[in-house]
């Protein structure tokens, strides 16, 4: 029998792998793993993104900017109803990203994702990456 922490970790790993925005079936994975009213806190934004449909729309727009982006899992830790993982992401900016036209430049940064899981579904999540570093690597702001 698996423990709650083991189940939650498995959900997080599936989300990180199959729910990654360049995976052709990521939206199906999100349907299976997320609550319909999931709450997403993106990079310390003042207001969260609420609801599965809104989360999908936002995620789709992010991955249009870096259609070849890939991630490497570095660490994963779970306790109780929470799982946090750190990945290295890298890709080429060939589409619009957060209102910025394509630069053709590559980026490589670390990011963190924290998931709160309730009843085997992602109920809330936080994502943090250094967007200043991304913009510097794209040549949009000076170092």
Language-model segments: residues:
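C-terminal and inter-domain tail/linker signature
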Residues: 1-143
């Amino acid at each position: 029998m698996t423990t709650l922490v083991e189940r939650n970790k498995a959900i997080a790993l599936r989300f990180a792998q199959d729910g990654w925005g360049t995976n052709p079936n990521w939206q199906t994975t999100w349907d299976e793993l997320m609550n319909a009213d999931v709450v997403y806190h993106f990079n310390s934004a003042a207001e969260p993104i609420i609801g599965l449909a809104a989360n999908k729309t936002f995620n789709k727009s992010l991955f249009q900017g870096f259609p070849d982006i890939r991630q490497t899992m570095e660490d994963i830790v779970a306790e109780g109803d929470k799982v946090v993982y750190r990945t290295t992401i890298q890709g080429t900016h060939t589409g619009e990203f957060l209102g910025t036209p394509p630069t053709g430049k590559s980026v490589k940064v670390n990011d963190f994702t924290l998931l709160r899981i309730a009843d085997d579904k992602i109920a809330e999540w936080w994502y943090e990456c250094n967007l200043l570093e991304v913009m510097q690597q794209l040549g949009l702001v000076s170092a």
